[in-house]
């Protein structure tokens, strides 16, 4: 029973973490819309979530690091390395080499893509917690 709850919360935690990371990436793209040569970035949310969940199920935490020197800084257990950032291919080229398409960035940031799904995930987690609390209180 507790394993099911832990797996559910782990999935939701990773989904929220990835959505937050994507929100930061999209915001950085918008902030650099006028920077010459800036390359717009993004992540493949579904692929990253799948990779994270597969790594979590096998008990590994992403890449396995080997310390070959006593001067290496050890990585904390459970630390997740960064998501694979992808370059976004522009629909229209610009003279200064900047690949940020403001219409696309705004639609990904605000219209129901990332932020609405983030809020939906938070709402879902809240409803799960309330349901569990109700079951525990009823005994």
From Swiss-Prot:
Q: Which InterPro entries match?
A: Flag_bb_rod_N (IPR001444), Flagellar_basal_body_rod_CS (IPR019776), FlgB (IPR006300)
GO terms for cellular component? bacterial-type flagellum basal body, rod
Annotated keywords:
Bacterial flagellum
Q: Which domain of life is it from?
A: Bacteria
Q: Which GO terms describe its biological process?
A: bacterial-type flagellum-dependent cell motility
Q: Tell me where it mainly resides.
A: other
One Pfam short name: Flg_bb_rod
Q: Where in the cell is it found?
A: Bacterial flagellum basal body
Membrane-crossing residue ranges in chain numbering: none
Q: What does this protein do?
A: Structural component of flagellum, the bacterial motility apparatus. Part of the rod structure of flagellar basal body.
Oligomeric state and interaction partners are given as: The basal body constitutes a major portion of the flagellar organelle and consists of a number of rings mounted on a central rod. In Gram-negative bacteria, at least four rings, L, P, S and M are present, whereas Gram-positive bacteria lack the L and P rings. The rod consists of about 26 subunits of FlgG in the distal portion, and FlgB, FlgC and FlgF build up the proximal portion of the rod with about 6 subunits each.
Recorded family membership: Belongs to the flagella basal body rod proteins family.
The cross-references to PANTHER family, in alphabetical order and at most eight, read:
FLAGELLAR BASAL BODY ROD PROTEIN FLGB (PTHR30435:SF12), FLAGELLAR PROTEIN (PTHR30435)
The name this protein carries in UniProt is Flagellar basal body rod protein FlgB
What is the scientific name of the source organism?
Proteus mirabilis
The organism's taxonomy opens as: Bacteria, Pseudomonadati, Pseudomonadota, Gammaproteobacteria, Enterobacterales
